[in-house]
């Protein structure tokens, strides 16, 4: 991150210095007091804590039968010296404290002017003005009145004679929105995003808020079970740039919930990197970090920008992200008043990156500070060219005495963005060239001042924005001064504003949890029992209208062993092998907590002509069925719905680059984790399609069959068939309505049930039906098979060569009929054709 540290209140920092170390010197950052390490779970409890536990105390709850007691320690009353005696009380009437906020969208640019500017930027770089650098801002009155600017700068200078401790404590007591803090998130950046998301009508997260169903994903009432109402929606992609430790991203992953979003992160590597291990509101496994070609996360490096653009394109199938957020700043210690001048290249590069990675119609949120210079205002103007609409706003969660504000850009226009992107890349390379030469020159303008001034409506709006914020900042600087002198003063509205704002932003009013949850949804059952092997008889029926082949779906397996149960907990991943659970290194198995899967751990195969080579990468974790996906219990859904959800889950976990970096400094290392993917599902009617993805090779006289999934290949070891309806039911075909139905000799009163009623009547088999075979289930299945009903919840069709006979991949693929009573592809197709023929006679109706 480019760390914010406020010396009253323009943000300053020291790059590559941790917030905690720097806090001792300049303790005024907009985020600094919220990023605190969680207590170690192994930390010994004090006697007082043990006594409180015996009384029934739990973190975040009050004592008492109904937990009605206070939750916070009683505040200590203090007074330092004689400060506060004889000082005047602050006049609250000078402030405007509200819960709701009104955002103002700037007037959209005229379409003719938009085209003219793009045409101009394509032709040449004459608008790029290079001249001697400027190090003062006092005379920048083109976009703000001289008096407003002077008053603000003078208000800042008053604090040069005050201690940092007094200023910080004054801010804590004076800012009416201070107690909002970071809520249950990593830091205050998350709450800024929550604040902005709500007041901009959810254009950041793109939540469908019509009937408030989105709140089912993140219930406001603690203890309410969350529901994934967006399971069927497309994956939401976002990028977080210059934004360590990651508050923006933690909010977005929390708001989208479950596995509905995938984030990309780009920030300075080092101590101020993303603190993914501190994410508690969501899983950091849905977030992929990247540091550019230079591996330093410098957003101003031209090569890094190009590599980030390429990565996002690869990771989003060439579409780009729906949303980009940027939150950059760097150290301007001692030069706070010219922060805008010193930050100009950072401004430029953050806006440039948005044009590189945001998709058509996508949105962009970026924090800025002062915008008084022609360079900054020119950037804002160019954003109007590239987006449908833009807005400038300072939210409640941005401390009122600093100059921070946000630009919100809605609806990227890709054609205009391409033109402006290339122009800004040329500007950035020019700035890089001047920097490398230690030149005293600088790029001072991006477009002529007279072009900007000719847009009278824009000029009016930018001046009004600057003057309103300058006045508000001046008022709160004066309030800080008053509170610093009178240490007995507190803003009386802080508590009420916190509660009301959280409610308005639809954020639960709760505390940040301390650590992971090892709980899981795993039910107890006997894991030792195995389902019968696949046979042709499972596709046969004595009832003419039955279509047993439609009762099954299958996936190919690439591992020699049968599929294995995998469980992700709060701090570990376990897989069931050889009769017991084994732990996998969680750095290599990136599976979020509260996840239960059935997986095929397969080695990827590379081919060179007829040669076969096993990939050196860790084996793939292929999902062949799913029970719980990061807390989303899909176990009772139909099999195909479970697999569709698992496909989205795997896409959210997908790493664009195979290697990731863990640790930093001399402890940093690159590792290659297991990739997670979802197996492709087929019906038996789709055997031809499945066959088209098979490759038959000979190696050392042995036939080997590979199957393709996307751009990967695996050795075909077996097929797993899953029955999609419960064991009691049989599937038939209705000639009259041309749809499938189910019936059961065990439930004759139920009659025949058409497909559109299966969900309501709970006909579909569950995950547990096809994975766990209890002794009772095994006995029932055996009895049914003895009576000719060969309905098996799941079964494995092994393709491995048989040591005693010639049965194996070659016979399975090429033999025209069953071989030694064992299934082949031709035999299955013949059985399907025979079954279809039996449904044709006109005298069979139900």
From Swiss-Prot:
Pfam families: FtsJ (PF01728), G-patch (PF01585). Residues 30-50 are annotated as: Disordered. One of its GO terms (cellular component) is nucleus. GO terms for biological process: 7-methylguanosine mRNA capping; methylation; mRNA processing. Residues 44-90 form the G-patch domain. Residues 184-413 form the RrmJ-type SAM-dependent 2'-O-MTase domain. GO terms for molecular function: mRNA (nucleoside-2'-O-)-methyltransferase activity; nucleic acid binding. Transmembrane segments: none annotated. InterPro entries: G_patch_dom, mRNA_Cap_2O-Ribose_MeTrfase, RNA_MeTrfase_FtsJ_dom, RrmJ-type_MeTrfase, SAM-dependent_MTases_sf. PROSITE patterns: G_PATCH (PS50174), SAM_MT_RRMJ (PS51613). It comes from the Eukaryota. This is Inactive cap-specific mRNA (nucleoside-2'-O-)-methyltransferase 1B. It comes from Caenorhabditis briggsae.
């Amino acid at each position: 991150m480019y760390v914010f540290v406020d010396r009253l209140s323009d943000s300053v920092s020291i790059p590559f210095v941790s917030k905690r170390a720097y806090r001792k010197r300049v303790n005024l950052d907009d985020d600094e007091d919220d990023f605190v390490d969680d207590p170690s779970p192994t930390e010994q409890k004090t006697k007082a804590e043990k006594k409180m536990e015996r009384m029934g105390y739990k973190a975040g709850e009050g004592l008492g039968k109904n937990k009605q007691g206070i939750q916070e320690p009683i505040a200590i009353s203090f007074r330092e010296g004689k400060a506060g005696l004889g000082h005047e009380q602050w006049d609250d009437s000078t402030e405007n404290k509200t819960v709701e906020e009104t955002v103002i969208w700037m007037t959209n640019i005229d379409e003719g002017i938009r085209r003219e500017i793009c045409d101009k930027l394509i032709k040449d770089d004459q608008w790029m003005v290079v001249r001697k650098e400027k190090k003062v801002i006092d005379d920048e009155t083109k976009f703000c009145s001289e008096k407003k600017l002077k008053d603000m700068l003078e208000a800042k200078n008053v604090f040069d004679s005050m201690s940092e401790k007094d200023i910080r404590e004054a801010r804590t007591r004076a800012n009416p929105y201070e107690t909002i803090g970071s809520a249950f998130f990593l830091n205050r950046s998350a709450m800024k995003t929550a604040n902005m998301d709500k007041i901009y009508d959810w254009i950041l997260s793109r939540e469908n808020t019509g009937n408030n169903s989105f709140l089912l994903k993140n219930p406001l009432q603690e203890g309410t079970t969350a529901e994934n109402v967006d399971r069927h929606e497309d994956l939401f992609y976002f990028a977080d740039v210059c934004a360590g430790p990651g508050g923006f991203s933690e909010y977005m992953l929390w708001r989208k919930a479950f596995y509905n979003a995938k984030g990309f992160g780009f920030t300075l590597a080092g101590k101020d990197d993303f603190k993914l291990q501190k994410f508690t509101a969501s899983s950091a496994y849905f977030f992929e970090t990247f540091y550019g070609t230079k591996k330093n996360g410098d957003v101003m490096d031209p090569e890094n920008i190009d590599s980030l653009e390429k990565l996002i394109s690869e990771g989003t199938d060439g579409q780009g992200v729906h949303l980009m957020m940027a939150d950059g700043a760097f150290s301007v210690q001692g030069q706070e008043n010219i922060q805008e001048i010193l930050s100009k290249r950072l401004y430029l590069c953050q806006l440039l990156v948005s044009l590189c990675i945001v998709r058509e119609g996508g949105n962009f949120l970026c924090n800025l500070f002062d915008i008084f210079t022609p360079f900054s205002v020119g950037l804002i103007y160019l954003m109007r060219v590239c987006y449908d609409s833009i807005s400038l706003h300072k939210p409640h969660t941005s401390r009122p005495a600093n100059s921070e504000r946000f630009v919100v850009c809605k609806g990227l226009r890709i054609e205009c963005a391409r033109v402006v992107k290339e122009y800004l890349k040329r500007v950035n390379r020019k700035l890089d060239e001047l920097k490398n030469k230690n030149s005293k020159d600088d790029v001072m303008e991006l477009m002529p001042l007279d072009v900007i001034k000719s847009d009278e409506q824009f000029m009016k709006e930018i001046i009004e924005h600057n003057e309103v914020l300058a006045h508000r900042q001046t008022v709160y600087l004066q309030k800080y001064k008053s509170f610093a002198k009178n240490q007995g003063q507190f803003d009386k509205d802080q508590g009420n504003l916190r509660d009301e704002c959280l409610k308005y932003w639809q954020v639960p009013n709760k505390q940040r949890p301390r650590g992971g949850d090892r709980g899981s949804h795993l039910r107890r059952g006997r894991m030792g029992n195995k389902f019968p092997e696949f046979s042709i008889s499972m596709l046969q029926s004595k009832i003419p209208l039955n279509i047993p082949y439609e009762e099954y779906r299958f996936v190919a397996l690439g591992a020699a062993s049968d599929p294995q149960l995998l469980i992700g907990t709060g701090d570990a991943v376990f897989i069931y092998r050889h009769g017991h659970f084994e732990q996998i290194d969680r750095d290599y198995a990136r599976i979020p907590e509260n996840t239960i899967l059935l997986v095929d751990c397969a080695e990827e195969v590379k081919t060179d002509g007829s040669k076969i080579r096993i990939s050196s990468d860790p084996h793939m974790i292929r999902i062949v069925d799913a029970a719980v996906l990061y807390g989303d219990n899909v176990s009772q859904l139909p099999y195909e719905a479970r697999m569709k959800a698992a496909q989205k889950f795997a896409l959210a976990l997908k790493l664009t680059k195979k290697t990731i970096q863990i640790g930093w400094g001399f402890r940093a290392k690159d590792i290659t984790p297991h990739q997670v993917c979802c197996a492709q599902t087929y019906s038996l009617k789709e055997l031809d399609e499945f066959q088209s993805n098979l490759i038959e090779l000979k190696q050392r006289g042995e036939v080997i069959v590979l199957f393709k999934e996307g751009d990967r290949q695996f050795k075909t070891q077996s097929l797993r068939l899953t029955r999609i309806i419960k064991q009691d039911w049989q599937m038939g075909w209705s000639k009259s309505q041309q749809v499938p139905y189910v019936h059961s000799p065990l439930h004759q009163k139920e009659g025949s049930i058409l497909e559109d009623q299966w969900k309501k009547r709970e006909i579909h088999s569950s995950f547990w039906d096809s994975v766990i075979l209890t002794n009772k289930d095994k006995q029932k299945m055996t009895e049914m098979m003895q009576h000719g009903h060969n309905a098996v919840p799941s079964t494995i069709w092994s393709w491995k060569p048989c040591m005693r006979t010639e049965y194996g991949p070659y016979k399975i693929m090429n033999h025209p009929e069953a071989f030694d009573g064992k299934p082949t592809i031709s035999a299955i197709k013949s059985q399907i054709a025979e079954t279809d023929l039996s449904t044709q006679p006109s005298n069979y109706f139900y």
